[in-house]
Amino acid sequence: MMFKQYLQVTKPGIIFGNLISVIGGFLLASKGSIDYPLFIYTLVGVSLVVASGCVFNNYIDRDIDRKMERTKNRVLVKGLISPGVSLVYATLLGIAGFMLLWFGANPLACWLGVMGFVVYVGVYSLYMKRHSVYGTLIGSLSGAAPPVIGYCAVTGDFDSGAAILLAIFSLWQMPHSYAIAIFRFKDYQAANIPVLPVIKGISVAKNHITLYIIAFAVATLMLTLGGYAGYKYLVVAAAVSVWWLGMALRGYKVEDDKVWARKLFGFSIIAITALSIMMSVDFMVPNSQNLLTYVW
């Protein structure tokens, strides 16, 4: 029973979703030549770091989680794990994850993990989520870290491919998160969380969703245009982007915003999963200069 509670507080669904993107970034960089020990170290390391961040987030958010319907039954809210124990647990998970990335992958992968962790826990969870409408934007940067870590674990470089991955996954996070905020509007309102739909209105959020999907579509194409992914990837990327954009545009005419937002959210998962799979299997050897080469 206790195992289940310690697992739940790490948010397994979030860990699984991040692992899909880590695999995408790792295999994109591997170009068919997979270092399996490195692959395992990277996956487990990122999983532990994400788990640590989620436990810290649960600790920080336990007051507002009580006010939200979807989070009122979380482990810390119900007192099934004490706050003090959760902090120790989160710290141990983080230390283990960072050590695996440092020694099992490379220092760059570890530092990227540290930066993503600090942004998520220190900047987003502790401050931006509660005080700024731009919290979602800041949070999107940490959400985009896992595929970049997977990529850089192989290359040891933060090159243009890594930058494109950062752009793709950051831009994807925005409509994905705004969709959640729309169909969970009352929850965010009750907890006084200043997400865009609550502060500026759902109609403004729809405009932002549309613009971010357009930007996302452009970013996805850059993997092929930059020589990192092939044309099969390009076709899938274009198809999911056009479909997702079409869903966003239909949102201007719907009668039930919550139903529409839930569908948009659901397709966002399909879209990013499809892209992660395609970049894993349809890769090209790039011919581009590094933006930043990490020398160790």
Curated annotation (Swiss-Prot):
EC number: 2.5.1.141
Regions of this protein lying in the Periplasmic compartment: 29-37, 98-107, 217-228, 288-296
Record topology, Cytoplasmic segments: 1-9, 57-78, 127-197, 248-268
Entry function: Converts heme B (protoheme IX) to heme O by substitution of the vinyl group on carbon 2 of heme B porphyrin ring with a hydroxyethyl farnesyl side group.
Record-annotated membrane-spanning stretches: 10-28, 38-56, 79-97, 108-126, 198-216, 229-247, 269-287
Organism in which the protein naturally occurs: Salmonella typhi
Keyword Transmembrane: yes
Family: Belongs to the UbiA prenyltransferase family. Protoheme IX farnesyltransferase subfamily.
Extra information: Carbon 2 of the heme B porphyrin ring is defined according to the Fischer nomenclature.
Name of the encoding gene: cyoE
Protein name: Protoheme IX farnesyltransferase
Reactions listed under catalytic activity: heme b + (2E,6E)-farnesyl diphosphate + H2O = Fe(II)-heme o + diphosphate
Pathway involvement of the protein, from the record: Porphyrin-containing compound metabolism; heme O biosynthesis; heme O from protoheme: step 1/1
Keywords from the UniProt entry: Cell inner membrane, Cell membrane, Heme biosynthesis, Membrane, Transferase, Transmembrane, Transmembrane helix
